[in-house]
Amino acid sequence: MTEGDSARQVRQQLREQGLTPLEVNETTEKAKREANRFVLFRRGASTSELALITRQLATLVGAGLTIEEALRAVAEQCEKAHLRSLVATVRSKVVEGYSLADSLGAFPHVFDQLFRSMVAAGEKSGHLEKVLNRLADYTEQRQHMRTKLLQAMIYPIVLTLVAVGVISILLTAVVPKVVAQFEHMGQQLPATTRFLIGTSELMQHYGLWFLLLLFIGGFVWRWWLTDEKRRRHWHQVVLRLPVIGRVSRGLNTARFARTLSILNASAVPLLEGMKIAGEVLSNDFARTRIGEATERVREGTSLRKALDETKIFPPMMLHMIASGEQSGELDSMLERAADNQDREFETQVNIALGVFEPLLVVSMAGVVLFIVMSILQPILELNNMVNL
């Protein structure tokens, strides 16, 4: 039995052996594997896995291997079955005569429009190795930024959960036991103590309902944002917020500049590059404004002026883009602008977290102090009455 990724490949293998194939049938095992591919491919590939595959492919192509040979080698090096099957299927399409970009287009959930457009440009220009290396750098950079953001958010999230947990335990477990002692005093309790008792009873009786309400509210909010107009309006509001708005604007403008930079360096036309770069933005309002800027560039407006009219990009980035247009080095200036914006984004995140963390600690300490003082106040008043 001869094995291959497609019937055409099996026929070619048989002809190379001096045999004339009359009929090629797919085995049952192969059919089962094909039936399971949909499930495998739905898992896709993580950002780090995609960067590794791209880097390996760039290295092998640079070493002089054909696309088919490079894909075979990459598939053999994949440890996970779904990745190995994915790369093998891309290779089978290449063997059938499709271009690499068209072959990758069969899996848009893994290889997005940016990835495929750059590969197509690299194939046309004959610089596929450079394009793949740029793609690997870009993917690794995005993974690096995502990892740094997650690492920065871990401590505040844990601190918030601990604060909420401690306060909830105090209100639902500690306060009720202490309050039971106050019931036998027969005296007027201070206002702070009465407020604490009311809050504790509210948490005991309606705490679970409150959590359920939060869950339902989150679900309704997600459903509300499924409407394109409402989501775009909300994203516009987000960009206007004091701290979150600056962070969101910095993240999206840096992503746009870096994406357009590598597309421009890969010989992708500017208008097509702007369209693709706009699609990678996470903010719908910013994506709409980029679409409007693309139309203005199509009508003859300079890139700098078109982006300035979006009211999203910072002045420094616009100056660098204008300099790149005048000097003919737009891709390098866009890359520098993206680097500057990434550094500013990291600074803004660090400042925001630097302010949030002590505020959270102080707030938690204030709440705990309020609970303790509300409990101690009637006890101290009782001691004073006894001493008198």
Curated annotation (Swiss-Prot):
Topology within the bilayer: Multi-pass membrane protein
GO molecular function: metal ion binding
InterPro entries: GspF/PilC, T2SS_GspF, T2SS_GspF/T4SS_PilC_CS, T2SS_GspF_dom, T2SS_GspF_sf
Entry's localization field: Cell inner membrane
Family recorded in the similarity comment: Belongs to the GSP F family.
Periplasmic topological domain residue ranges: 175-205, 372-388
Region (Disordered) location: 1-28
Cited NCBIfam families: GspF
Keyword Protein transport on entry: yes
Annotated residues for binding of Ca(2+): 79, 133, 137
Quaternary structure and partners: Type II secretion system is composed of four main components: the outer membrane complex, the inner membrane complex, the cytoplasmic secretion ATPase and the periplasm-spanning pseudopilus. Homodimer. Interacts with ExeE and ExeL components.
GO biological process, one term: protein secretion by the type II secretion system
Topological domain spans for side Cytoplasmic: 1-153, 227-350
Any one of the GO CC terms: plasma membrane
Keyword Acetylation: no
Domain of life from the UniProt record: Bacteria
Transmembrane segments: 154-174, 206-226, 351-371
Keywords annotated in UniProt: Calcium, Cell inner membrane, Cell membrane, Membrane, Metal-binding, Protein transport, Transmembrane, Transmembrane helix, Transport
Protein name: Type II secretion system protein F
Entry-linked Pfam families: T2SSF
Task performed by this protein: Component of the type II secretion system inner membrane complex required for the energy-dependent secretion of extracellular factors such as proteases and toxins from the periplasm.
